[in-house]
């Protein structure tokens, strides 16, 4: 791992190493399956609004829904989305942390609010 465990513990209360660090893709690129560095220019440099995320993900076949989520969006609030993960089970998700590693999480809401933020929006396939 790139950093000591204490670094990762400060971001999430439940994380399990899944794959090595790489700058070739990020959280959104992993969640959508593109495995590229995916951050539309309409999102701005660090966060996106719910309307921006809804619009972008709709072009990929996703819509907001509380049921059967495929992609989870995190942030300070619904109009400050900064991170995404891919649902892998009823309570599990997997996320790429920027240029850092890929991690499994034992919760759909695994982050401390001071880092990636809380779960804000769930997206399902159309």
Q: Can you annotate each of these PLM segments?
A:
Residues 45-101:
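...with weaker cross-activation on analogous glycine-rich loops/strands in unrelated enzymes
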């Amino acid at each position: 791992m790139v950093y000591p465990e204490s670094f990762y513990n400060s971001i999430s209360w439940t994380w399990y190493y899944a794959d090595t660090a790489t700058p070739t893709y990020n959280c959104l690129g992993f969640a959508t399956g593109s495995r590229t560095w995916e951050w539309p220019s309409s999102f701005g440099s660090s966060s996106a609004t719910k309307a921006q995320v809804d619009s972008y993900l709709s072009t990929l076949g996703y819509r907001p829904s509380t049921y059967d989520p495929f992609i989870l969006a995190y942030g300070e609030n619904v109009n400050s989305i900064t991170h995404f993960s891919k649902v892998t089970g009823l309570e599990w998700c997997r996320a790429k942390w920027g240029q850092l590693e890929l991690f499994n999480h034992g919760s759909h809401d695994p982050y401390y609010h001071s880092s990636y933020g809380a779960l804000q929006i769930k997206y399902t396939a159309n």
